[in-house]
């Protein structure tokens, strides 16, 4: 197979134009078929927006070697398709392996074990995605929180109520990244995620994909249980022998993949009490900022935003503040919503969420600043958790149980907003005016304020006074890391930490890939 990179075409090109470019690159050598492997928008020249393609081309028998011998184009090369293959099980298990958690890491770990014929028991503290959706909608409308069924807990994990981004910086020579995307497509995700430079599913489509994976696990003999919270771990002589479910039932097992998500603070506490080795780690905290989608689109695409049918524009911004903190955009949601993502009573955190069409009036992103264990009160494993809880409590209090919102102008002046400008919030969850400076450490507030000013040099209008701020974004990643060895096992034999909650991933795809890796370790001698 031959790959042709850097095929550039106008945004409004027809399919025939791509085929013509392929023929030209091949000097009219006959080819059987082509497959788009990557497509991105080049918006560096706003007056000349273009798509840039990479395609894989299959030539006729004997033609590939002949063509490559004569080829002098550095954008054309031979490639071999990487097809990930999960190994056959090599171990004997007295009891079925258990997967704790049904976010991307747990789902893919369970899927791999099920496809290997191991009939895993899959435990999720929250509800299935359909009933979870009802609880979340009720919370957004009424403010009544179900601590076990919310934006953080339930089938699909926190990513179910997000933008559904699938890009990752994790490199994997074995093809796990592609495998994850292909699995999503098998279960109903749009095929474009296989080649778009910044693939995303959207929360509306992701829910059905997650349910489809669950049903495959069940069809292969997996035992999937909802509202099954792991409340304790039975450990004898440094080895796991069982799990306690809902403080009642004991499930015997010698192998449990632990994928609880980054908000399973009660689980972290139990594990700490059981002497599982874990350490606090750096993360980031901040606010969600909202701008008009049209403003962001015009900034990124120029006049092309009006001329062409383009996806809602995204951005990625970074800044190093004078106080030494890194400030950056995180989990940018084009055409999306700011959602109340709380999971604990009297504590409040937010996140961003988009549907597949990304058609909402505002585009939002977290603007966050780094915090390290030096910022925490104490140096034990749960110090970062307590840090999050402290500021989430302040946010809950400031908003009187609702999402506290403020204009950028008033944030800088430290006063409560009385009325909005042209921009109004686009949220899922009730809102209230509040002073967000009371909800963040002062060095973080200062770094964010400074960063917003700098970001205006990259995106005109980013620093406008009526920019909406919503707070706080406290769950950007896990506040701790559960240590594991080269075999992916913790210091307690039989417990295999996994995914974002354990500190080994950031986002849907990397968490899913980590779930596959850990499942692979489990079945390999």
What does each model-identified segment do?
Residues 2-51, 55-525:
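Residues forming the flavin
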């Amino acid at each position: 197979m031959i790959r042709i990179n850097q095929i550039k075409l106008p945004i409004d090109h027809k399919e025939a134009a791509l085929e013509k470019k392929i023929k030209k690159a091949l000097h009219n050598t006959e080819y059987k078929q082509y497959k788009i492997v990557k497509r991105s928008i080049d918006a560096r020249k706003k007056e000349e927006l273009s798509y840039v393609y990479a395609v894989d081309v299959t030539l006729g028998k004997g033609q590939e070697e002949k063509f490559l011998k004569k080829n002098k184009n550095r954008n054309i090369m031979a490639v071999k398709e990487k097809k990930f293959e999960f190994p056959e099980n090599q171990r004997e298990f007295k009891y079925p392996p258990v997967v704790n958690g049904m976010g991307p890491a747990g789902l893919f770990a369970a899927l791999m074990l099920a496809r290997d014929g191991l009939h895993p028991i899959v435990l999720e503290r929250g509800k299935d995605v359909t009933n979870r959706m009802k609880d979340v909608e009720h919370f957004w409308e009424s403010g009544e929180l179900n601590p076990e069924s919310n934006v953080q807990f339930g089938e699909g994990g926190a990513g179910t109520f997000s933008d559904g981004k699938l890009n990752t910086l994790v490199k994997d020579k074995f093809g796990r990244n592609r495998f994850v995307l292909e699995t999503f497509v098998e279960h109903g995700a749009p095929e474009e995620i296989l080649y778009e430079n910044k693939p995303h599913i959207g929360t509306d489509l992701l829910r059905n994909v997650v349910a489809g994976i669950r049903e495959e696990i069940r069809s292969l003999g997996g035992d999937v249980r909802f509202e099954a919270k792991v409340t304790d771990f039975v450990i004898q002589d440094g080895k796991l022998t069982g799990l306690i479910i809902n403080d009642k039932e004991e499930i015997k097992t010698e192998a449990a993949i632990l994928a609880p998500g980054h908000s399973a603070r009660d689980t972290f506490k139990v594990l700490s009490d059981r002497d599982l080795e874990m350490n606090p780690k750096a993360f980031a905290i901040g606010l969600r900022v909202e701008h008009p989608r049209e403003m962001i689109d015009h900034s990124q695409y120029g006049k092309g935003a009006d001329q062409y049918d383009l996806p809602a524009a995204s951005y990625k911004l970074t800044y190093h503040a004078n106080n030494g903190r890194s400030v950056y955009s995180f989990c940018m949601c084009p055409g999306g919503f700011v959602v109340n993502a709380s999971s604990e009573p009297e504590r409040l955190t937010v996140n961003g969420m988009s549907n597949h069409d990304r058609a909402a009036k505002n585009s939002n992103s977290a603007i966050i600043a780094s915090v390290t264990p030096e910022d925490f009160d104490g140096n034990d494993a749960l110090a970062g958790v307590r840090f999050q809880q402290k500021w989430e409590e302040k946010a809950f209090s400031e908003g009187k149980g609702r999402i506290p919102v403020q204009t950028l102008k008033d944030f800088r002046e430290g006063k409560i907003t009385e009325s909005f400008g042209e921009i109004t919030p686009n949220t899922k969850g009730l809102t209230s005016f509040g002073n967000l400076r009371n909800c963040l450490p002062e060095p973080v507030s200062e770094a964010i304020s400074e960063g917003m000013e700098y970001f205006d040099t990259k995106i005109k209008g980013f620093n406008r006074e009526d920019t909406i701020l919503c707070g706080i974004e406290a769950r950007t990643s896990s506040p701790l890391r559960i240590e594991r060895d080269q075999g992916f096992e913790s210091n307690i034999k039989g417990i295999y930490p996994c995914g974002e909650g354990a500190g080994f991933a950031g986002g849907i795809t990397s968490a899913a890939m980590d779930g596959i890796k850990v499942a692979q370790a489990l079945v390999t001698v």
